[in-house]
Amino acid sequence: MQAYLDLIDKILREGVRKPDRTGTGTLSIFGYQMRFDLGAGFPLVTTKKLHWKSIVHELIWFLRGDTNIGYLKDNGVGIWDEWADDSGDLGPVYGRQWRSWQAPDGRTIDQIANVIDEIQRDPFSRRLLVSAWNPADLPAMALAPCHCLFQFNVRDDSTGTRRLDLQLYQRSGDAFLGAPFNIASYALLTELVASVCGLTPGDFVHTFGDAHLYLNHIDQAKLQLSRDPRPLPRLRINGNVKSLFDIRFEDLSLENYDPHPVIKAPVAV
């Protein structure tokens, strides 16, 4: 995960101070890209311990089309608690946009089901996109989408293996707390879609707009940079699962994850 540490290092060296919505203040860079070969291991940061259970259950929650934190709470995940209202609702956030985008004529569009169908029907299409950025719904969202657009790509490599890539565009990225989580989440999504579509995982490409370190995360970021990355773990997926929407936590296993200890930092709300 040297690619991730390089991002942290660049922000610390070149970031400019900017005010932000939370009032915390940031060091920020604009326009940055990382690439991860999923064949080299699952890109779960090893220079601090991440909560695998939260990563998996949040993605399952998105794929369910859910926008209430009840499912997350039932599974011991509290990462969305700060933004939910008293009934646990978040408004039309990721799950709604992914699975039930509201069309002007009253229809709802299941972007995830559509993109899987398209991968299977026309794998070399350049229209394999999913967007969570719906301007009409932004005012009703508890938090505007940070990771707002992703695109799949199918290609045959030099050995004739058909691979699935994914590129994420993230308009805003909390480099210390959020980015490691986002890397793992979209790498997992790539692996899952590849599995149900009979493809081999290829590259995960992570493109940022504003990538930043909050000013109260600087010491933690420097501590993380002082640690040497360890070998990446391997992800195993239950091969009996044929639908993306049937995935359960128990269908996934992470092998040989040996991270450095957790580094705590406050969440900017």
From Swiss-Prot:
Active-site residues (renumbered): 146
Chain residues that bind dUMP: 21, 126-127, 171-174, 182, 212-214
Domain of life per record: Bacteria
Keywords: Cytoplasm, Methyltransferase, Nucleotide biosynthesis, Transferase
UniProt catalytic activity: dUMP + (6R)-5,10-methylene-5,6,7,8-tetrahydrofolate = 7,8-dihydrofolate + dTMP
InterPro entries: Thymidate_synth/dCMP_Mease, Thymidate_synth/dCMP_Mease_dom, Thymidate_synth/dCMP_Mease_sf, Thymidylate_synthase, Thymidylate_synthase_AS
E.C. number(s) listed in UniProt: 2.1.1.45
GO molecular function (one): thymidylate synthase activity
Enzyme's top EC category: transferase
Metabolic or biological pathway: Pyrimidine metabolism; dTTP biosynthesis
Subcellular location: Cytoplasm
Any Pfam family hit: Thymidylat_synt
Assigned protein family: Belongs to the thymidylate synthase family. Bacterial-type ThyA subfamily.
Function: Catalyzes the reductive methylation of 2'-deoxyuridine-5'-monophosphate (dUMP) to 2'-deoxythymidine-5'-monophosphate (dTMP) while utilizing 5,10-methylenetetrahydrofolate (mTHF) as the methyl donor and reductant in the reaction, yielding dihydrofolate (DHF) as a by-product. This enzymatic reaction provides an intracellular de novo source of dTMP, an essential precursor for DNA biosynthesis.
Quaternary context: Homodimer.
Name this polypeptide is given: Thymidylate synthase
